[in-house]
């Protein structure tokens, strides 16, 4: 049966993927979803259908819980790496930590069963990391947008390089959308040469599921985008706020301690993870 793991199931993209898969499970009972998150209660709050679905299993814990992540990934056909944060946190390593945890888990599973069929990895990234996807964006605007998310993009680029280095035994696709908004699904298209802003999280999720279902190797180690099939009416106004704060955190990273969304790690905590 088709089986999917969603790492970061309570985030904006993760919950949208869970919802898209649950909608499909209504008509295809073979589908199984493994939702990995830090809080089961939050998952049920942001995606109420998950609480009663027989097609979904919740794996609650941290990414450094080896046995839990092994259990979550075992037997899946595709894994969505969508753990993310919303602002430009200095020293962010969320994408890299997720990539390392998944690679380590798949290595353990392969060591236990050398004949195991490994899942395809579908990784959330950004169009700003693929210059050809942003050809229609004026250079000054692109510079501002890229600088406002500089710490996150550095993390995403490092994770992508790390995963590409595993191409001899892993299959991965890097999904790089434009600006995202909370809006209804309007239809989507997987695109190889451009991105488009705005794009709804639900359309992004549907596109990522389409990529995950492509088992013919067409997206192996490729960068793709998802574009809306029709114009999205909602403008990403919250992006304006995050652009201003992101620029502040880029040029004055010390201000994040007072204005950022998340708690900064201490040097001791970073050294412990390394």
From Swiss-Prot:
Tell me the Pfam families matching this sequence: NAD_binding_10
Q: Name one GO biological process term.
A: sterigmatocystin biosynthetic process
Q: Does the keyword Oxidoreductase apply?
A: yes
Domain of life where this protein originates: Eukaryota
Q: Which GO terms describe its molecular function?
A: monooxygenase activity
Name the InterPro entries on file: NAD(P)-bd_dom, NAD(P)-bd_dom_sf
Q: What is its EC number?
A: 1.-.-.-
Inducing stimuli: The genes forming the sterigmatocystin biosynthesis cluster are co-regulated and induced on oatmeal porridge or the fungal isolates were grown either on oatmeal porridge or in YEC medium (0.2% yeast extract, 5.0% corn steep liquor). Expression is positively regulated by the cluster-specific transcription factor aflR that binds the palindromic sequence 5'-TCG(N5)CGA-3'found in the promoter.
Keywords, alphabetical: Monooxygenase, Oxidoreductase
Q: Cite the annotated pathway.
A: Mycotoxin biosynthesis; sterigmatocystin biosynthesis
Q: What does this protein do?
A: Oxidoreductase; part of the gene cluster that mediates the biosynthesis of sterigmatocystin (ST), a polyketide-derived furanocoumarin which is part of the most toxic and carcinogenic compounds among the known mycotoxins. The first step in the biosynthesis of sterigmatocystin is the production of hexanoate by the fatty acid synthase (FAS) units stcJ and stcK. The polyketide backbone is assembled by the non-reducing polyketide synthase stcA by condensation of the starter hexanoyl-CoA and 7 malonyl-CoA extender units followed by cyclization and release of norsolorinic acid.
- Write out the similarity annotation: Belongs to the avfA family.
Q: What is this protein called?
A: Oxidoreductase stcQ
Q: Which organism is it from?
A: Emericella nidulans (strain FGSC A4 / ATCC 38163 / CBS 112.46 / NRRL 194 / M139) (Aspergillus nidulans)
Read off the lineage from the record.
Eukaryota, Fungi, Dikarya, Ascomycota, Pezizomycotina
Q: Which gene encodes it?
A: stcQ
């Amino acid at each position: 049966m088709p089986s999917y793991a969603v790492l970061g199931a309570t985030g904006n993209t993760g919950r949208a993927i869970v919802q898209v898969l649950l909608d499909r499970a209504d008509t295809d009972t073979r589908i199984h979803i493994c939702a990995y998150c830090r809080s089961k209660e939050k998952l049920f709050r942001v995606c109420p259908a998950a609480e009663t679905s027989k097609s979904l299993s919740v794996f609650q814990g941290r990414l450094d819980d080896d046995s839990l992540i092994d259990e979550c990934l075992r037997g899946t056909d595709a894994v969505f790496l969508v753990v993310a944060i919303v602002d430009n946190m200095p020293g962010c390593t969320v994408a890299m930590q997720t990539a390392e945890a998944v690679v380590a888990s798949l290595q353990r599973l392969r060591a236990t069963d050398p004949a195991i069929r490994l899942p395809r990895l579908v990784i959330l990234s950004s169009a700003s990391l693929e210059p050809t996807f942003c050809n229609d964006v004026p250079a000054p605007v692109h510079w501002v947008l890229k600088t406002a998310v500089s710490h996150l993009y550095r993390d995403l680029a490092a994770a992508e390089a790390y995963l590409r280095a595993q191409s001899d035994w892993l299959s991965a696709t890097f999904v790089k959308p434009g600006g995202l908004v909370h809006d209804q699904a309007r239809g989507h298209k997987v695109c190889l040469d451009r991105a488009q802003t705005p794009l709804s999280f639900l359309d992004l999720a549907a596109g990522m599921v389409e990529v995950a279902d492509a088992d013919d190797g067409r997206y192996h180690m490729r960068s793709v985008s998802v574009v809306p099939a029709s114009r999205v009416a909602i403008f990403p106004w919250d992006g304006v706020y995050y652009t201003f704060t992101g620029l502040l955190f880029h040029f004055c990273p010390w201000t994040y301690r007072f204005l950022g969304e998340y708690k900064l790690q201490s040097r001791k905590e970073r050294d412990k993870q390394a």
